[in-house]
Amino acid sequence: MQVHNVNLTISAVRPEQYPDAKLPEVALAGRSNVGKSSLINTLINRRNYARTSSQPGKTQTLNFYNIEDLLYFVDVPGYGYAKVSQKEREKWARMIETYFSTRQELKGAISLVDARHEPSELDCQMIEFLHYYNIPVLVVGTKIDKIPKSKRNKSESQIRKKLQLTKNDRLILFSAVDKIGKDEVWNWIESITKVN
């Protein structure tokens, strides 16, 4: 998809703040600092539109990015950051569950994992959670440029096995640096949102 117009419409914490436009939505979820902002920036051909941060736990709201008035990317707060209080984590969990369990416009979720490491228990829980709500899932293994080509198949099978991916779940290896996987991610987004 050629992207020229992007706009951060709203940062929401409650359903009444979600956008009214009945556009399809794709959520992006993953651990803090897994590369959600880098994926968004790569997909929309911008360098720093979605703020990348060296400080984990920076995204604390559901950020709705309007893409060409055709769909929304919804950036979900990163999980697994230890310096966030238990109370704050519970608040985020409620906010995220409300969104995933009630949002009619949500067409699918991209779950990001760091391809250099085995997925964590929290990564596994996220996939289980998405399966529970019957949300189509694309798993994106990030930072693939840091893995030698000879070891990428091993990384891919490790992710599949640990996350217990079903035959309906797609897995794409991705690099924001080399743009590996960018077109495949867009193809998946277009297929589930029916936009192109």
From Swiss-Prot:
Cofactor needs: Mg(2+)
Positions contributing to GTP binding: 30-37, 57-61, 75-78, 142-145, 174-176
InterPro entries given in the database record: G_ENGB_dom, GTP-bd, GTP-bd_ribosome_bio_YsxC, P-loop_NTPase, Small_GTP-bd
Domain EngB-type G: 22-195
Any Pfam family matching the protein: MMR_HSR1
GO biological process, one term: division septum assembly
The keyword Nucleotide-binding appears for this protein: yes
Keywords on record: Cell cycle, Cell division, GTP-binding, Magnesium, Metal-binding, Nucleotide-binding, Septation
Listed GO CC annotations: cytosol
Positions bound to Mg(2+): S37, T59
HAMAP family (UniProt xref): GTPase_EngB
Family the entry assigns: Belongs to the TRAFAC class TrmE-Era-EngA-EngB-Septin-like GTPase superfamily. EngB GTPase family.
Its biological purpose: Necessary for normal cell division and for the maintenance of normal septation.
Name recorded for this polypeptide: Probable GTP-binding protein EngB
Organism encoding this protein: Ligilactobacillus salivarius (strain UCC118)
